[in-house]
Amino acid sequence: NGIELYRDKPVSSWDIREDGRIIGVTEALAAQDIYELGEKVDPFILAEGTRMGHIHLSVKDSREASQFYQKVLGLEDKFSIPSASWIAAGQYHHHLAVNEWAGKGLAPREQGLSGLAYYVLEVESKEELLNIVKQAQELEAPIKWLNSSELDLVDPDGIVTRIRLARWNEENTLFILET
């Protein structure tokens, strides 16, 4: 969850060195004052039934996060570099990517902060759900059952994955009720 705010100065005032490097200036921004000047809007909520092909998560340690999701969710590594990993089920390029591009000192996510509160992963059977629970318990990952077919799993970075049995409508097609 990052945004860069800047205002370009005229090129004539840039600090351009003989070797072509441009030396930038970073100054503290009075973010709260600027926020107070703006129009307040309701938080953005995805439309009901929105389905994602894949998501990217900011984590403190991409290797640790990748191994966690591989062990607990049964995903496979598709491609990794020292600061990121792309993992998936089956032959898909990636369902989940984790990266540490926000910094190695990234604090665990806390409930109530801006950004992704949780994402939903649907599984096809109770056995699959219980296997995820077993794998999570082996890693001592926090689990909170919401009902008999839905739980929240918290990863080492404080990111919540809501896992539930797939729901079907009268046309027998998969859909997500969450917004």
Regions found by a protein language model. Give the residues of each.
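Glyoxalase I/VOC metalloenzyme domain signal
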Residues: N1-F79, G90-N147, V154-T179
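Beta-rich nucleic-acid/ligand-interaction surfaces
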Residues: A84-I87
